[in-house]
């Protein structure tokens, strides 16, 4: 297993950081903050999709746009580590892209739902850190959706029903953050990621580091 990322002289394998939440709980905002923070050094996983490219989107930057036939080939050959169908379009993550990034010590952020998180944890459990964001109350969640002023009352009600179902999946995740205050929640998630980066089993370079440390002659 190639490991090329080095921190404090110790090589480390990359992470797949999965963040999920019901609509309105704060996932997208926190994901954006993580990606914009240069100290976190996270990159967004770029999915393949069969969806039509929008005028503002760039192939290879926002998504890799492919045909349904090509997607089916990738899926059937187990070249996707997770995939889902959303509103009639297919989305997925290329296994090869993820494995190259992990071996290079790169940490990737996955903004996906519980189904995608399930697939990642089943296929690459040692590399996944999963975080589920909860609202403090359902009333607060509804108020946040209302404040968006993007959806009709009917759509908001549907989102709330979906949220109740999604929240039931919280037990599948490694970490749970109750997002009552954005700043505190963001700080908590940064702490989770930084702690996971220091785990012994993610840092195979520690063996050589400790061996060298013990062989050192402090008098030299």
Swiss-Prot record:
The gene is gmk. Residues 14-194 form the Guanylate kinase-like domain. Its main location: cytoplasm. ATP binds at residues 21-28. The lineage of its organism: Bacteria, Pseudomonadati, Pseudomonadota, Alphaproteobacteria, Hyphomicrobiales. Its EC number is 2.7.4.8. It is found in: Cytoplasm. SMART domains: GuKc. CDD domains: GMPK. Gene3D superfamilies: Guanylate Kinase phosphate binding domain (3.30.63.10), P-loop containing nucleotide triphosphate hydrolases (3.40.50.300). It comes from the Bacteria. It is an enzyme of class 2 (transferase). Keywords: ATP-binding, Cytoplasm, Kinase, Nucleotide-binding, Transferase. InterPro entries: GK/Ca_channel_bsu (IPR008145), Guanylate_kin-like_dom (IPR008144), Guanylate_kinase (IPR017665), Guanylate_kinase_CS (IPR020590), P-loop_NTPase (IPR027417). Essential for recycling GMP and indirectly, cGMP. One of its GO terms (cellular component) is cytosol. PROSITE patterns: GUANYLATE_KINASE_1, GUANYLATE_KINASE_2. Belongs to the guanylate kinase family. It holds the Pfam family Guanylate_kin. One of its GO terms (molecular function) is ATP binding. It comes from Brucella abortus (strain 2308). This is Guanylate kinase. It catalyses: GMP + ATP = GDP + ADP.
């Amino acid at each position: 297993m190639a490991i090329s990322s080095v921190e404090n002289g110790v090589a480390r394998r990359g992470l797949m950081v999965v963040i999920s939440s019901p609509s309105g709980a704060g996932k997208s905002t926190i994901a954006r903050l993580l990606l914009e923070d240069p100290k976190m050094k996270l990159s967004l996983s770029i999915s393949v999709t069969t969806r039509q490219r929008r005028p503002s989107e760039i192939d290879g930057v926002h998504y890799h746009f492919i045909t349904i036939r090509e997607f089916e080939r990738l899926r059937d050959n187990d070249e996707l580590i997770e995939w889902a169908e959303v509103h009639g379009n297919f989305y997925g993550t290329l296994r090869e892209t993820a494995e190259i990034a992990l071996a290079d010590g790169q940490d990737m952020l996955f903004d996906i739902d519980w189904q995608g998180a399930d697939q990642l944890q089943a296929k690459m459990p040692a590399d996944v850190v999963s975080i589920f964001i909860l609202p403090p109350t359902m009333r607060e969640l509804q108020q946040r959706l209302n404040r968006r002023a993007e959806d009709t009352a009917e759509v908001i009600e549907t989102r709330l029903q979906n949220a109740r179902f999604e929240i039931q999946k919280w037990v599948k995740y490694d970490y749970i953050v109750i997002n009552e205050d954005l700043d505190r929640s963001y700080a908590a998630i940064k702490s989770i990621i930084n702690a996971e980066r220091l785990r012994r089993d993610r840092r195979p370079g520690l063996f050589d580091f400790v061996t060298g440390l013990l062989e050192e002659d402090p008098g030299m």
